[in-house]
Amino acid sequence: MGSVAGARVKLTNADKVLYPAAGTTKGDVFDYYTRISEVMIPHIAGRPATRKRWPNGVEQESFFEKQLASSAPDWLPRASVTHRSGTTTYPIIDSLDGLAWIAQQAALEVHVPQWRFVAEWTRSKAEELKPGPATRLVFDLDPGEGVTMAQLCEVAHAVRDLITDIGLTTYPLTSGSKGLHLYTPLTEPVSSKGATVLAKRVAQQLEKAMPTLVTSTMTKSLRAGKVFLDWSQNNGSKTTIAPYSLRGREQPTVAAPRTWEELEDPELRHLRYDEVLARVARDGDLLASVDALNTRAPVRDRLTTYRSMRDASKTPEPVPSAKPATEHGNTFVIQEHHARRLHYDFRLERDGVL
């Protein structure tokens, strides 16, 4: 049996059962990912996709896959990241066809970081994708032994209230596994290091406020009876299960967006893929605001050509997301200039020209 998504991906072995306890087949997985693509893609587009594959179903062995295989289709976008162990080329899933390819690979889980690739100009005037700043925060609420869903939700509400106090908004998900995930969109991107520091401070503050229920410490022996508020997934080298991704559990559950009202329900549980499809058809994407703030196109002005000729990795110059309004078209600018020796430039900008 075969199927086609966007005339590019052919589904094979559609009747193969990947979730034996539920009878869910590879064809069902393919159908889910193609139908959920419209709401899932905004949360993973532009980010390196790590896949966790179960080629023989969830009762058999699985493996993580980062490096894009040489057999991957040419039309699939890709970009490379340099790690301590070497350089890895990742697929970028930004289309229905990309998600269909994920399903055909029996990659039930998709994991992404909190940053997106950004385009930079090289000395040869070629555009190259490089890891960019974080566009959102994520908190993984991991229950220790004996922790109930109600206690997880109590901690989630406390995180939400603390984040609200600093002027940001938080959106909850049931992870499809054991815990809850909380996403906070950033009004302006920040470095992954900065995002990690902020998330850690939030976790430590909650630990002080709720010491019998919350821990920000990774030591597993200290987690019994507590919620581990995992802030570390904001690190640029780490990933989190993507919103709307399936999970490789006994049942075909999903990392599913929820409402805060639902988190007050004592019967709150994880959702299956068919339930998530029905919810999206009814309510749309509950996370639509999470990845909508940082999708603006770069500002074009009289310096666009000049900046395109610079090597931003050597001498970066900050470019505002919106042109500042000035009464007479004149602006004084102080720029931190990373040349051979760090120095600061004091410049006059008149009508968009420095």
Residue ranges and their predicted role:
Residues 141-143, 184-186, 348:
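Short beta-strand-to-loop capping motifs
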